[in-house]
Amino acid sequence: MKPHLHKVKRIFDYTDKSEYDFILNQSERSQPIPQSYYTKFLRSLKQEDFAYYPNTKNFKEKICNFYNVKPENLFLSDGSDIGIKSIFETFTTCGNIVTSEPSFPMYKVYSSLYNCQYKGIHYDKDTRQLSIEHMLKFVDDETQLIILANPNSPIGDYKTIDEIKPLLDTGIPVLIDEAYIEFSDKESFIKYIDDYPNLIITRTFSKAFGAAGCRVGMTFSNPHYIENISKFRQMYEISGVSMKYCEFLLDNHHIVEKYINDVVEERKKILTLMKDFSILNSEANWIHFNTHDDNLKTKQILDKHKVLVKYCKIHPYGKRENWCRITIQPGLSEQEFFKELLNELS
């Protein structure tokens, strides 16, 4: 066994979501798609979708048309985290990885698995912003990959292409993880992959498309990068049923667009209603909030109503340990548990 693996600790989440009435802890879509469309999809399924290995050619072409890229710019994977894993396998050989801290935890996991030094750059203590200039100070000759979630999780901030250009100018592969970009009014960097040969973008069907259970992710980059990343692909990247559902969502993208718009409007509404709370807004489909008692009463109310959320410490410099991260869903502000939160804690 590789000696460094002894230091890697993984956590398995076996939370039984059926015990909760509201699932708002992992940025998933908990609002069902319209029943008529779901029924239409179910009727489209055939036994062959389960019995045979999938042919992804047409699906890949549909993705490329949707994102206005060429097939040689796309790598399809079993979730975007497998795309990220394949990027580690392609570019890292025990060098160092530079990213923001906190961020998506799998960056650190993959750094450990591939025996890379993980350099997590903290947000500024005073401004609570991530300084790209400061981040660059940790990039050296041993840096093999720079990663930036954009918008970031859990902070929810966004960097423009001009802001990250100094990272791209290093010539080191730069991975921009755009898992939440659809909930932002900011631009995606996919259109820049022809301008920057070291730019890599990952996207997912899990968040805005509401298909987390399908495990379908995409990586976009220049043909040379994609050719080499694809050497680490699984024999069959995704299941036939997952492919068919995601293809259905692309064909009926107005369902996705409505959900995104409804989430963004609900997020604005909730920020107004929770003006008396400590709030960390985001460019994603969630917010963090805290109260004078570090969310002690919040937890009592949400537990009573069987609401599953996530509690965490966001900033390494913050004194409060128990920020509540809640996924924004259309109509969230009309739920009884939310009204009770406002009445009890405002």
PLM regions: where:
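Active-site phosphate-binding strand-loop segment of PLP-dependent enzymes
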Residues: 126-182
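N-terminal "arm"/small-domain region of PLP-dependent enzymes with the aminotransferase-like
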Residues: 1-52
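Phosphate-binding glycine-rich loop
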Residues: 57-96
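PLP-dependent aminotransferase-like
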Residues: 89-148
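PLP-dependent aminotransferase class I/II
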Residues: 32-33, 198-273, 277-280
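Conserved PLP-binding catalytic core of the aspartate aminotransferase-like
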Residues: 264, 276-306, 328
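Short acidic capping loops at alpha-helix termini that bridge into adjacent secondary structure
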Residues: 70-74, 95-96, 142, 178, ...
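Conserved PLP-binding active-site segment of the aspartate aminotransferase-like
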Residues: 221, 288-294, 306-345
